[in-house]
């Protein structure tokens, strides 16, 4: 079995085509590159993204559960990737680049939070077990919304990062809700002290008035296939400076999309089974397997499943206001159909608490999460 997996993975890497030589601009998480003159910088950027794949031989989930997530954990791994990118932006900045000769500092703290251990904040163990509260048994396949909801709940325990996570439902981003969320608890210290992951965090004065924001927007862009009217808007999401990318893929096959070139989406593929990594006694982590060191995968944008979640990271209130302006300009430009709208206050037709309540601590949150998660079983809408 292991030999077969190794052969399969080796062939997958060997068959990955090189990046195209094209004059069209390449966009990766808010950065623009030329494939003709900046190919090395482009590939270095992509390689620097944390790449989470299937793993085997990790601690049994829940003590008696699975020791591998092969076949069921791809969306969980994609959720880890988009959230890891948020933490990279939060702690080391979007322009940070991986140096495999000198992996250290806050980067290792980030990676530690995703290791396959029960006490890592965003481990496969934590996501799978928190998912039980979302109505998903351990080993069941997730859709984009479920993994977003689970990550939001896990982030509460990550005091080192001290981030606010907002999931915008019903294709609507309500600015007032986000302002309240990011200002909540601003008088509390963000010093986490000694954390369960084995590292310490220091308070960040920049968080005193506004918590850095991770904004996740679950969307449905069609029935069994994406509506072509959304394609240009989807591409634009990778051009916004605050972009975290998109989690989605094909039915029952999730990918983490990080950019595009022409009509092709660029993505990291979690469907490779690797051995679980354990840090050594001196806290050294063998981290090369967490970075994709072959040319990235690509697929035509029309092939993406319509059920996705789009992510953005806003480091400050000014950054969030800048994001709002980007999105509003896009909606006014005409042509492409907006995937979601940004409004200052909750529209009246959504304000009835018996219909919808999107406040973070709403008692109806679990009911709403499941209501909006009907794509999870097959990762595409089967009926309306």
Swiss-Prot record:
Tell me a GO biological process for this protein.
Answer: autophagosome assembly
Q: Which Pfam families match?
A: ATG4_LIR (PF20166), Peptidase_C54 (PF03416)
EC assignment: 3.4.22.-
Query: What's the catalysed reaction?
Result: [protein]-C-terminal L-amino acid-glycyl-phosphatidylethanolamide + H2O = [protein]-C-terminal L-amino acid-glycine + a 1,2-diacyl-sn-glycero-3-phosphoethanolamine; [protein]-C-terminal L-amino acid-glycyl-phosphatidylserine + H2O = [protein]-C-terminal L-amino acid-glycine + a 1,2-diacyl-sn-glycero-3-phospho-L-serine
SUPFAM superfamilies given in the database record:
Cysteine proteinases
- Quote the catalytic residue positions: 74, 269, 271
Cited InterPro entries: ATG4_LIR, Papain-like_cys_pep_sf, Peptidase_C54, Peptidase_C54_cat
rRNA-binding: is it a keyword of this entry?
Answer: no
Question: Where found, per UniProt?
Answer: Cytoplasm; Cytoplasm, Cytosol; Cytoplasmic vesicle, Autophagosome; Endoplasmic reticulum
Span of the annotated motif LIR = 379-382
Record's keyword annotation contains Transferase: no
Q: Report the domain of life of the source organism.
A: Eukaryota
Record key words, sorted: Autophagy, Cytoplasm, Cytoplasmic vesicle, Endoplasmic reticulum, Hydrolase, Mitochondrion, Protease, Protein transport, Thiol protease, Transport, Ubl conjugation pathway
A GO molecular-function annotation: protein-phosphatidylethanolamide deconjugating activity
For this UniProt entry, what's an example GO CC term?
cytosol
Task: Report the sequence similarity comment from the record.
Answer: Belongs to the peptidase C54 family.
What PANTHER family does the record point to? CYSTEINE PROTEASE ATG4, CYSTEINE PROTEASE ATG4B
Q: What exactly does this protein do?
A: Cysteine protease that plays a key role in autophagy by mediating both proteolytic activation and delipidation of ATG8 family proteins. Required for canonical autophagy (macroautophagy), non-canonical autophagy as well as for mitophagy. The protease activity is required for proteolytic activation of ATG8 family proteins: cleaves the C-terminal amino acid of ATG8 proteins to reveal a C-terminal glycine. Exposure of the glycine at the C-terminus is essential for ATG8 proteins conjugation to phosphatidylethanolamine (PE) and insertion to membranes, which is necessary for autophagy.
Which protein is depicted? Cysteine protease ATG4B
UniProt lineage: Eukaryota, Metazoa, Chordata, Craniata, Vertebrata
Q: Name the gene.
A: atg4b
